[in-house]
């Protein structure tokens, strides 16, 4: 009971703790900082150190966001940030951005955390929907990729498609032969 203005969906259903900030909000921050100005002021929030420095629910992009920008955001490993997975000790000499689970672990009584980037080797598939208002509604495109977003190519599938493209058909190829 109380005024609607006092209700916080996030606080009621998904209270923020270190894990939620570092594994979920950090990925939102990575997107936001790519398209909007002044997002570095929320780095401590994204890293799970300052839950009170809450990010906005949405941002105004500094310019029109292209499909390629969204593709690049989906392929992100926090490059160029304090959480850059290609530059920490886990990256080794090859700057490998992949970490094996669990995300949190302990060595000699000290707790550590691996990042949970947007692009990850556990991805089954990913997609980006592109609406193009100057075309008829059925000419929208679903850009579809299989496996890790950082290393997979994208196949355009038009919204007007009536069948699964041959290259993605279950009848095309065999995993056992």
Q: Which role fits each region the language model picked out?
A:
Residues 1-177:
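C-terminus-biased signal that marks the final domain/tail of proteins
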């Amino acid at each position: 009971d109380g005024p609607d203005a006092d209700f916080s969906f996030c606080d009621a259903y998904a209270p923020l703790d270190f894990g939620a900030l570092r594994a979920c909000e950090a990925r939102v921050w990575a997107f936001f900082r790519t398209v909007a100005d002044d997002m570095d002021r929320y780095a401590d929030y994204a890293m799970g150190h300052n839950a009170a420095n809450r990010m906005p629910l949405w941002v105004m992009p500094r310019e029109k966001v292209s499909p390629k920008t969204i593709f690049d955001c989906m392929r992100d490993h926090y490059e160029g940030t304090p959480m850059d997975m290609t530059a920490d000790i886990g990256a080794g000499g090859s700057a490998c951005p992949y970490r094996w689970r669990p995300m949190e672990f302990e060595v000699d009584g000290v707790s550590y955390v691996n990042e949970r980037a947007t692009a990850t080797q556990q991805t089954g598939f990913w997609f980006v929907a592109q609406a193009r208002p100057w075309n008829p509604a059925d000419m929208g495109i679903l850009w579809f990729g299989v496996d890790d977003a950082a290393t997979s190519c994208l196949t355009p599938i038009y919204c007007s498609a009536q069948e699964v493209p041959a290259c993605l058909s279950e009848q095309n190829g065999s995993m056992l032969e």
